[in-house]
């Protein structure tokens, strides 16, 4: 007797993630599930798809990211990444939670219902990230626990407050326990940690990390028992340095992540498909690269029947014509071929900017006979170098120039104050840039060499309700982000176009080869080495305390 199924896929080279090879075989799909891999004479399909000799892989999975870094809502983000073969992501809504607390998480969950992209949320573990900055909300364990009743919540996101774990902070330990009690798992954030410190994380149950910047760090995490998310984002370009650590013997412990990637970069180079392409270009067997991007990611996140193309697995897949270019795959999610979906953007209520800055506020008194502590940008990385250098001082005040810019972080929720410092690496000849995206508390952050333009940039953020600004001698270019000062209410095509205009405006005052806004956003993140700035001042990661600009 013949059984009727939904789809028969034939004439394809289909990835076998268990034996790390492509087979000339077939798939039989019924509703959202793969019924059988191989030839069957007793099955009949309502629909047949001839792959034309193309390559079929499981839907690609992003192991760790922040949707907000794309400046898009979850539903709009889905429209951007699904055409790249992405069918599932693990998102930490830390950014919007830092601004709007529980209501921010609820907003992300609700908006995600408008996209066929499978979005698993990891609950933000550290809001605020440390006690060294003011955020728009504080989330304790009791605020997060109810979310574990939501199927789309997969665990606790990157635990980044190492001192809280090491000192057995009761609230942090409760957050970890609540995740484990709910049958979920806990992601790590182990930037700059020693092997001894990694052991502290592992011993409380943290089992993944995405902060490796090179092969040595990746192997340290592997030896400690972590699953490693190989990061390749807009600023965090770590993959090439990590690839030498991956072998046939250990590949099952690696998956890919973008962490923070702009919509512009996703459209132009790709998402996880770019990570796969980069791995293949650097000598990795395509079967291994795609397995890392699919099955390994599902396993790291404790998902069953996800990430493989065989009997009983969910029918998420991508069809590529060849493995050399990985261009515009045909994508199936849950047994349905993807077509562009419609969505409606809703506002996030009760979000406004509450800060004030004047030129006298951002003046930086210094002694001309003393060196100053400098935040030194590391291009394409979110870490910085802490240097001590002579800087220009006139009449007792720091004077910014193309080498040394001024950087300011202003608390934007309750007008509690601001920090002022010096940053090297933006190479601005004039003007200023400003943003309401400043990890992780998302206060107002401004960098510039012209105080008038810096204040104008701050005032402009007020006027547009949050976003990103370039000011050049009074000429203003903006990208409004009305949803929490983090996300646009526009289609991704419009956001990309406006972002390109913003970058063009910045190119008129600087020639740096990296994304200035994403780089700027991480200059306020004190849990990443080495020297950062918050609304409370300069923060030394090694001392894990504040320091003054001059000793």
Curated annotation (Swiss-Prot):
The keyword Phosphoprotein does not apply. GO terms for molecular function: adenine deaminase activity. Its cofactor is Mn(2+). Keywords: Hydrolase, Manganese. CDD domains: AdeC. One of its GO terms (biological process) is adenine catabolic process. The keyword Transcription does not apply. NCBIfam families: ade. Belongs to the metallo-dependent hydrolases superfamily. Adenine deaminase family. PANTHER family: ADENINE DEAMINASE (PTHR11113:SF2), N-ACETYLGLUCOSAMINE-6-PHOSPHATE DEACETYLASE (PTHR11113). This is Adenine deaminase. It comes from Leuconostoc mesenteroides subsp. mesenteroides (strain ATCC 8293 / DSM 20343 / BCRC 11652 / CCM 1803 / JCM 6124 / NCDO 523 / NBRC 100496 / NCIMB 8023 / NCTC 12954 / NRRL B-1118 / 37Y). The lineage of its organism: Bacteria, Bacillati, Bacillota, Bacilli, Lactobacillales. The gene is ade.
């Amino acid at each position: 007797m013949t059984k009727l199924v939904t789809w028969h896929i034939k004439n394809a080279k289909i990835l076998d993630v268990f034996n790390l090879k492509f087979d000339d075989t077939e798939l039989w799909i019924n509703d959202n599930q793969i019924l059988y891999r191989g030839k069957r004479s007793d099955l009949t399909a309502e629909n047949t798809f001839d792959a034309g000799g193309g390559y079929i892989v499981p839907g690609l999975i992003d192991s760790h990211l922040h949707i907000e870094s794309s400046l898009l809502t979850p539903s709009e983000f889905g429209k951007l990444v699904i055409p790249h073969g992405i069918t599932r992501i693990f998102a930490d809504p830390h950014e919007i939670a830092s601004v709007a607390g529980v209501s921010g998480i609820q907003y992300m969950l609700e908006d995600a219902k408008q996209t066929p992209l499978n979005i698993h949320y990891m609950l933000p573990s550290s809001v605020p990230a440390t006690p060294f900055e003011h955020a728009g909300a504080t989330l304790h364990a009791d605020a997060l626990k109810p979310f574990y009743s939501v199927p789309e919540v997969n665990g606790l996101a990157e635990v980044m407050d190492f001192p809280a774990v090491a000192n057995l902070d009761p609230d942090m330990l409760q957050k970890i326990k609540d995740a484990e009690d709910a049958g979920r798992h806990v992601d790590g954030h182990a930037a700059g940690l020693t092997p001894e410190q990694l052991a502290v994380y592992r011993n409380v149950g943290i089992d993944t990390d995405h902060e490796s910047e090179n092969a040595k760090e990746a192997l340290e995490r592997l030896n400690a028992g972590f699953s490693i998310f190989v990061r390749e984002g807009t600023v965090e370009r770590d993959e090439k340095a990590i690839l030498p650590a991956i072998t046939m013997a250990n590949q099952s412990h690696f998956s890919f992540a973008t962490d923070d990637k702009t919509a512009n970069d996703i459209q132009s180079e790709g998402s996880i498909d770019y990570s796969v392409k980069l791995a293949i270009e650097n000598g990795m067997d395509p079967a291994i690269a795609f397995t890392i991007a699919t099955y390994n990611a599902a396993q790291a996140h404790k998902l069953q029947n996800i990430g493989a193309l065989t009997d009983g697995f969910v029918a998420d897949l991508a069809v590529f014509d060849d493995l050399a270019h990985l261009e515009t795959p045909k994508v199936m999610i849950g047994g349905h071929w993807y077509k562009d979906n419609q969505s409606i953007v809703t506002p996030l209520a009760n979000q406004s900017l509450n800060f004030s800055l004047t030129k006298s506020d951002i003046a930086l008194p210094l002694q001309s006979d003393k060196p100053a502590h400098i935040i030194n940008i590391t291009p394409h990385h979110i870490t910085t170098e802490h240097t001590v250098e002579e800087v220009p001082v006139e009449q007792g005040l720091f004077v910014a120039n193309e080498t040394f810019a001024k950087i300011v972080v202003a608390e934007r929720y309750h007008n509690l104050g601001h920090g002022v410092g010096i940053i090297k690496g933006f190479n601005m000849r004039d003007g200023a840039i400003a943003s309401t995206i400043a990890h992780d508390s998302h206060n107002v952050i401004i960098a510039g060499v012209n105080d008038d333009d810096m204040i104008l940039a701050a005032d402009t953020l007020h006027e547009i309700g949050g976003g990103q600004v370039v000011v050049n001698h009074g000429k203003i270019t903006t990208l409004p982000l009305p949803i929490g000062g983090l996300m646009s209410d526009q289609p991704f095509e419009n956001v990309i176009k406006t972002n390109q205009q913003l970058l063009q405006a910045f190119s008129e005052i600087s020639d740096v080869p990296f994304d200035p806004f994403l780089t700027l956003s991480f200059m306020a993140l004190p849990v990443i080495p080495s020297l950062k700035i918050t609304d409370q001042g300069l923060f030394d990661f090694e001392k894990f305390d504040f320091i003054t600009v001059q000793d």
